[in-house]
Regions:
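Flexible hinge/capping segments at coil-to-helix
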Residues: 14-29, 33-55
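Secondary-structure junction motif
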Residues: 47, 51-76, 139-141
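Extended ligand-binding regions for polar small-molecule ligands
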Residues: 48, 128, 132-154
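A local structural motif
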Residues: 72-82, 116
Length: 154
């Protein structure tokens, strides 16, 4: 995704490597929480609402910049944060610890079950979700089918 905090850096890297960002949709950030979370009944969740709960983020490794972070907001903004390496662990901690993570709001119940829900985050920011591909390259038939399937699903 591209956002106001990472767009300049990522687009420069894309350009320098003869790549192209193709936007699929624009999303407003959402909080992923357990359906039984104390904030689950709220229509919209504020940053202040989240301060009491652990923020779950993917470990980025020692050499990765925060510009490549999968999360939309910095873990520095929250007193409690836990780094995880995989989605299953993240969702188990969302459920077990009343934790949360922030993402696009796109969640598939067939893949993730019905225990995790997405609630809008009360921020005036957007995420431009897309794919990155080589410039001047035509997708194979299978790659084209895959991208079209993604578009239909989203």
């Amino acid at each position: 995704y591209l956002s106001e905090h990472n767009e300049d850096v990522i687009l420069k890297l894309i350009k320098n490597n003869q790549l192209k960002f193709e936007e699929m949709f624009v999303a407003e950030p959402h909080v992923f929480i357990c359906k039984d979370h104390p904030l689950a009944e709220k229509e919209m969740i504020s940053m202040e609402d989240l301060r009491l709960y652990p923020y779950l983020v993917y470990e980025q490794g020692n050499n990765n910049s925060f510009y490549f972070s999968e999360e939309f907001i910095s873990m520095l903004d929250f007193p409690k944060s836990i780094q995880v390496r995989d989605r299953a662990t993240l969702f188990n901690l969302v459920i077990g610890l009343n934790g949360f993570t922030v993402s696009s709001g796109v969640i598939d119940q067939k893949l993730n079950g019905s225990s995790i829900i997405a609630k809008p985050l009360d921020v005036d920011k957007t995420m431009r979700i897309g794919i990155i591909k080589k410039k001047n390259i035509i997708f194979s038939r299978y790659a084209s089918y895959y991208v079209e399937a993604l578009r239909r699903h989203l």
